[in-house]
C-alpha cells in the first residue's frame, strides 16, 4: 500500500474528537454561554414570548456555532506553521496531517456560509454582526495582529465579544445598553483570561515567534495589564442595573474576588505559573457564573 493511499485513508477518517479540535469546540461552547444569555435577557427584558422565541434562540445558537467553528477551522489552517513548532499543538489534526488543506477549507467556509445563512434568516443585524465577528477574528486577529503586535489579545477581544450581541439582536433586532454591557463583560474578560494562558505558555509562544505580552514584555508587565483590565471590568455590572441590585452586588463581589486573587503575592518566580493557572481557572468559572447568574436573576423577575 502506497504512502499516499495510507495518508488518504487517514484523512478520510477524521473522528469526532479530532473534528472538535479543528473547530475548537471548547472555545465555541464557552462563547455560546454569553450568546444564549444575550438572547434570554432580550426575551425577558423586552417582554417577548419565550415559547415563540425558542425557534429564534435555537437558530441563533446553530448559526453562532457554525460561524465560530468555521472561523476557528480557518484559524487552524492559517496557523499550521506555528502550531508545528509549539509542543502543546502537536495533537491537532492540522499538524499531524489528519486532514488536507482542501478539506479543511471546505469545512471552514461551508460552516461559515451555512452559519451566516442562519443568522441572516433571523434578521439582517444578526448576520452583519456574524460577518463582523468572522472578519475580525480571521483577518485582524489571526492573520495580522497575532503575529505582529503584543496588542493581539486586545484586538482579538473585539470579535470574541460579539456572541452576546448576536444573541440579543437575534431576538430584539437592535443593540441596546444591556447588549453593550454584555459585550463589555466578555471584552474585558478576554485579556485577563488569555494573558493567564499566555503566561503558562510563554516559552512556546517565544519559540514560535508569536509576540504575546508575557513573552515580549515579561510577567510583571503582563500582571499589571491584567490588573488594569480587572479594574475596567469592576464597574461594568452597574450597566446591568435593570437586572436588580442583587445581581449588581453579586457580580461586583465576583469581580472583587478576581481582583483579590490577582493581588496575591508570592516569593518565588516558580509561583508565577501557579498564579497564572489560578487566574485562568477563575476566568473559566467567572464567565459561566456571571451569565448563569444573569439568567437566574432574570427568571426571578418573572415570578
UniProtKB/Swiss-Prot annotation:
This is Protoheme IX farnesyltransferase. Belongs to the UbiA prenyltransferase family. Protoheme IX farnesyltransferase subfamily. HAMAP family: CyoE_CtaB (MF_00154). It comes from the Bacteria. InterPro entries: Protohaem_IX_farnesylTrfase, UbiA_prenyltransferase, UbiA_sf. It comes from Staphylococcus aureus (strain bovine RF122 / ET3-1). Interacts with CtaA. The keyword Transmembrane helix applies. Pfam families: UbiA. It is a multi-pass membrane protein. It catalyses: heme b + (2E,6E)-farnesyl diphosphate + H2O = Fe(II)-heme o + diphosphate. PANTHER family: PROTOHEME IX FARNESYLTRANSFERASE, MITOCHONDRIAL. The gene is ctaB. GO terms for cellular component: plasma membrane. Converts heme B (protoheme IX) to heme O by substitution of the vinyl group on carbon 2 of heme B porphyrin ring with a hydroxyethyl farnesyl side group.
